[in-house]
Amino acid sequence: MKKLFILIMVFSFITSFSQANSLELGSPAPVIEVLTDQGTTLDLGEALSTGTALVFFYPKAMTPGCVKQACSLRDGWDELQARNVSIFGVSSDTAEKQAQFRDKYTLPFTLLADTEGRIADAFSKSRWSRQAYLFRDGILVWRDLKAATSKQAAEVLVALDELAPNT
């Protein structure tokens, strides 16, 4: 029981620390090359430089909360696409595991492999925290440092409405 308590305390500290130091609103998109679920390299800074893009972080593919978060965005895909939102999901999983996750749940967006924590570091966040970031023309305009699971798409759509008319 004592070990569980210590583990919970450490996780809470890491999560609160990552929220305190997270990428600030108005910051430019991180410039970093990343590996996609297709096994290709993507210049994330360039991908976020034009239009509206969502980057959402989830701790681990195939786990219940992460499935709910990704499937929420999948289910909101048509409405997000109607608003021309590009979506990128990030976890510490390998590109192969991300591809399995994408295929199993029919995810229509690109997943990024962050096995070394470089993407999380570029966003100044913990690898294990669930967060979401909206960029417009390469600038961070909205962030959710305690991103929802099953309500992720709804929260992003509300944020887009609040950021209108430029959405």
What residues fall within each predicted segment?
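Short loop/turn microsegments at loop-to-beta-strand junctions
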Residues: A29-P30, T52, W128-Q131
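N-terminal "domain-start" segment that seeds a small globular fold
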Residues: S16-G45
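Bacterial N-terminal signal peptides
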Residues: I6-T15
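Short active-site neighborhood of thiol/selenol oxidoreductases, capturing the structured segment around
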Residues: L44-V67, L73
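Thiol-/selenol-based redox modules, centered on thioredoxin-like
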Residues: Y133-T167
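Positively charged n-region of N-terminal signal peptides that target proteins for export
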Residues: M1-L4
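Short, internal strand/loop/helix patches
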Residues: F88, A99-Q131
